Amino acid sequence: MARSGYTLPVFACAAAIAALQRLRQPAASIQSVDCHLIDPDQTVAIAIEQVAPLSPDRALAICRSDPGDNLDLTRGTPIWAEVQLSPRSPDQDSLAIEAGEGIGHSETGPAIYDYAQRLLRANLLPLLQTNEQLTVRLILPEGRRLAERTANAAFGVVEGLSLLGTHGVAEALSAPEQLQVFRDRLRQLSADPDLVIFCIGENGLDLSQKIGLPRDRQLKTANWLGPLLVEAGLLGIPRILLFGYHGKLLKLAGSIFHTHHHVADARREILAAYAIAAGASLEQVRSLLDFPTVDAATQYLDQTDPALASRLWPQIAEAIVDRSQAYIRRYSEQIPEIGVVLFGRDRQLLTASSQAQTWLTNRAIAQPLRYPSA
């Protein structure tokens, strides 16, 4: 059975708890701390690797990431939390959270997102006196290096990793056993003939909720898109909305239905092929293939030929629909309607298939599309 672990914010929070405990109890042995996950509503013990006082009012603690049986590059990476206690004035917040080395940042600030903020506040505020302020500085010593191997830059996060997540448990999404969990969830959703929303990854899940798509109809798919599309067909689910980052769902336009990069990655080649169909010149296609990432290629088109981009992305969305239905047709006589919504690195909606646009309109979700379908 695949083993679940915890998301990065949990280990950051545990390190902060341990550092604060060291200030409260300088002589105590701290091997682990209890951390309330909020979502799910449970308290778990998190191992602490090291903890040390730095001064009478400052301490440092270290955890190591354990994401369970996942293909996760943060496995074993250290997470440091440096805390400092100081007197609090009436106009100050009791908790100040700072991003240190290895924590990424975007145009809006440090990449310490909502769940991480709530987790820190829920666990640390009850430990403070009313006249105390705690400053927590989170550090990922290997964060800058690891970020080079992620898609963080595609979402505007640079110089480090993000503390992203909507819950505390890191399910073993890459393990075969997790596919069965997803199938069981899909069977539950099939009891209601309403739309089922396949959210590709944590960013897809988070953004779909923020724009108002119904949470109770969402299924986080990880990279198991092919098997889950087939399962949806076999279950007779009538409508599926694929909602995800354009650099991930682009693979479906090339009939790649297991989207983990360890399996296959031809995104630039797929983009170039559809660009030719949309009228790109040979020089433009060569430029697209020369860029290191799909995101860089997308920005190039946005800036140099928005007319081409406005043709290209809706065509890709429709191609994803066609290829997905063709894939289901191999295994099932029941073919659901499929809609596609793609978002970009700025977490704004890039384009949508014509069917998806209709569904969004019918649900009164008035999110603008950069490149709407004709």
Curated annotation (Swiss-Prot):
* Superkingdom of source: Bacteria
In terms of SUPFAM superfamilies, this protein maps to: CbiD-like
The pathway to which it is assigned is: Cofactor biosynthesis; adenosylcobalamin biosynthesis; cob(II)yrinate a,c-diamide from sirohydrochlorin (anaerobic route): step 6/10
Q: Which reaction does it catalyse?
A: Co-precorrin-5B + S-adenosyl-L-methionine = Co-precorrin-6A + S-adenosyl-L-homocysteine
Among its keywords, does the record have S-adenosyl-L-methionine? yes
Q: What is the source species?
A: Synechococcus elongatus (strain ATCC 33912 / PCC 7942 / FACHB-805)
- What protein am I looking at? Cobalt-precorrin-5B C(1)-methyltransferase
State the encoding gene: cbiD
Q: HAMAP family recorded for this chain?
A: CbiD
Task: Report the EC code(s) recorded for this entry.
Answer: 2.1.1.195
